[in-house]
Amino acid sequence: MGSPNDLHYIKTVCPTVTGSVLEVGARENSTGFRGYFAPTATEYIGTDLVPGSDVDVVCDLTAPENPLPKNHFDLVICCSVMEHVPNPWVMAEKIAEVVKPGGKLYICVPWAWRYHAYPDDYYRYSFKAIEYLFPDFAWDRYAYSSEMDGDIRWINKNEIGRDNKWVHVACDDQGKPIKKYIPYLLINLIGTKNA
């Protein structure tokens, strides 16, 4: 699952991975993470609640037992998944367990989005919410994105928490605002697990 901008974002902030990669929520992912990272990664594992063509391990990352190896993955990708989890704090803990110290975690979650059950739809997130759920990570490279291909707005960390009413503004050819809008809006950020 996810948007076309997920792959644009990850190519910018993490162009190559030579270690192990875990993709959480891989069943219906059309973003192409596997095709992009598998040629250079030593290992690529897709996980989901149910079987699918890109699912290597079927598991529930909110269950008491986590079948994935701890402190193992160089990169964990979790896009458009956490809004479907009734207890995201448990999932966040399980995801953090499998990222090796110094490893990366790429999270993309909706901030403004329509209801979409898979199997249900519980939450919307801000950057601060993700930082709170994953306290063992140093977060970097914040961005807003929409479902429109290439529509990514990079923001500085010091802009977090300020009024973001101008986060997406359509501009004319000279860069002057012509329309303020909030389309479906995702937040994207990558963090490095503290040693």
Task: Indicate residue ranges for each PLM-predicted region.
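A short, aliphatic-rich alpha-helical micro-motif
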Residues: C14-P15, K70, F134
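Short secondary-structure boundary/capping segments within folded domains
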Residues: K11-P15, Y36, K179
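Conserved long hydrophobic alpha-helices within structured protein cores
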Residues: V13-R27, D140-A143
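S-adenosyl-L-methionine-dependent methyltransferase catalytic module, highlighting the catalytic core
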Residues: P86-A96, K100, K104-A195
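N-terminal capping/interface segment
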Residues: H8-I10, L75-I77, Y184-L186
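Conserved SAM-binding loop
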Residues: G19-H116, G191
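Class I SAM-dependent methyltransferase Rossmann-like catalytic core
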Residues: M1-P15
